């Protein structure tokens, strides 16, 4: 009896730890076409698509790993898949490599997740927990806006729509098939999802 209770408790604990980052869907179940050639070309790649996204994510992995524990901590706190946070960080700042003193986008984007100071007041250090919390909370607000706008979409479709909205706002997401039209290089969610799937395979 005691052993049964211990096993049940362990099963509940494992279930909780899994669900603690899966509130907004499973990124591995999201379809993606990966990076457009417009995103691949500046990275000096002569191919596009999922392979290009994965190659860029691979190049960023060493820098990303410096923040792995922090990304996972924030993901658990906010119930967001850490791989999705990592995918956004790779796309936005190459895990910090593209920033000058923590800033990018001509001085408008702050931190690893490039919080736009024209829309939000950046908080914390550019590579710290408060910044990652803020960026991830912005992502959650976008996912929730898409959930409200498209209630019949699956969780995974809403997750992808929220990622697209993180770049161009929920108003830009007009249909599932064309959600990335109007995002940077017209591929934002597809590229981020493909990178996130790579990071998922590398312990995020």
Swiss-Prot record:
It comes from the Eukaryota. It is found in: Secreted. Keywords: Antimicrobial, Bacteriolytic enzyme, Disulfide bond, Glycosidase, Hydrolase, Secreted, Signal. GO terms for molecular function: lysozyme activity. One of its GO terms (cellular component) is extracellular region. Its EC number is 3.2.1.17. Coiled coil: none annotated. The active site is at residues 92, 105. It catalyses: Hydrolysis of (1->4)-beta-linkages between N-acetylmuramic acid and N-acetyl-D-glucosamine residues in a peptidoglycan and between N-acetyl-D-glucosamine residues in chitodextrins. InterPro entries: Glyco_hydro_23, Lysozyme-like_dom_sf, Transglycosylase_SLT_dom_1. Pfam families: SLT. Residues 1-19 form the signal peptide. The keyword Transferase does not apply. Disulfide bonds join 23-79, 37-48. GO terms for biological process: defense response to Gram-positive bacterium; killing of cells of another organism; peptidoglycan catabolic process. Gene3D superfamilies: 1.10.530.10. Has bacteriolytic activity against M.luteus. Belongs to the glycosyl hydrolase 23 family. Shows preference for N-acetylmuramic acid residues that are substituted with a peptide moiety. It acts only as a glycanohydrolase. This is Lysozyme g. It comes from Struthio camelus.
């Amino acid at each position: 009896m005691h052993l049964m209770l211990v096993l049940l408790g362990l099963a509940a604990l494992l279930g909780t730890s899994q669900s603690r980052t899966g509130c907004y869907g499973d990124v591995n179940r999201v379809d993606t076409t990966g990076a457009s050639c417009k995103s691949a070309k500046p990275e000096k790649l002569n191919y596009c698509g999922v392979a290009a996204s994965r190659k860029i994510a691979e190049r960023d992995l060493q820098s990303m790993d410096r923040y792995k524990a922090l990304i996972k901590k924030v993901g658990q706190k906010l119930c967001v898949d850490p791989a999705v946070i990592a995918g956004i960080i790779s796309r936005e700042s190459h895990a910090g490599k593209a920033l000058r003193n923590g800033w990018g986008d001509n001085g408008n984007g702050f931190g690893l997740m490039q919080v736009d100071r024209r829309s939000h007041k950046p908080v914390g250090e550019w590579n710290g927990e408060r910044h990652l919390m803020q960026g991830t909370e912005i992502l959650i607000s976008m996912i929730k806006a898409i959930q409200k706008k498209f209630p019949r979409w699956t969780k995974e479709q809403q997750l992808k729509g929220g990622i697209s909205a993180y770049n161009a706002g929920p108003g830009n997401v007009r249909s599932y098939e064309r959600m990335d039209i109007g995002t940077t290089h017209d591929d934002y969610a597809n590229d981020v999802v493909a990178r996130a799937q790579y990071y998922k395979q590398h312990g995020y």
